[in-house]
Amino acid sequence: MDRSVFFEALQNLPIKHPGLQLEFCADVGQQALLEGKADIAWFGYKPEERGLVAIPMGYNVSFLVASAKYLKSHAEIKKVGDLINHPIIMRDTANESFSQILQCEFCNYEIGPEHKILYGDSDACKKLLIEGKGVAIDMNPNFIAEELLDGTVQPVLPGWHRKPWPLHICCRKSSSKDPIIREAMGIIRYLALHQEPNDWKSWHRRLHLPEQMVLLPKL
């Protein structure tokens, strides 16, 4: 989902609530939220901290991608087992939504230690992907939208995808009844569930990927 949509919608809150100041931060974890370094956080997993309230917002599903440059200069990837011969670009293990599991309907494939793995944060992974360093497994399609639409980056192994991760909007339990906090969380959740042009299903349809191969677990 395109985060700019949320930023634009939330900008109206200070107009409605004079004196309210908004600040957007990256990479706020559970502890930072508990410590008051942020009041609301978006997580790609369900937090277990008892001091937090987590409201589900559906799932995000990425698909495997590589740059057109990489695909032209390397052996064709015909089946998931061929990934052993290609560097894998993925988010590092410090990311709470980290997963090494690829899925295709009822089939699973693990990116194990025998694979060559290039770890990084989202920016580093995007850079490695565009530079043609390997196959990325957990890039948010909205983060590489321009490259997907102009063909610089292309899907690999249609139907295979990283294990879906559950999206949650969270706040401290102590502030969960604050009307402004509730209003902001409601705006974010509504947009997350109704921004059809930017959800994972829309990307699958746009790129002619088999949506039926994605089996979502219950939140």
Where would I find each of the regions flagged by the language model?
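Central regulatory/effector-binding core of bacterial HTH transcription factors
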Residues: 1-50
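A local structural motif
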Residues: 17-25, 107-116
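Beta->alpha turn/N-cap motifs
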Residues: 28, 44-46, 66-68, 121, ...
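Short, well-ordered beta-strand core segments
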Residues: 39-41, 63, 88, 136
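Flexible hinge/capping segments at coil-to-helix
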Residues: 51-57, 61-62, 66-89
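Secondary-structure junction motif
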Residues: 86-108
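Hydrophobic hinge/microswitch elements
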Residues: 109-155, 161-162
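C-terminal effector-binding regulatory domain of bacterial HTH transcription factors
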Residues: 144-146, 150, 160-219
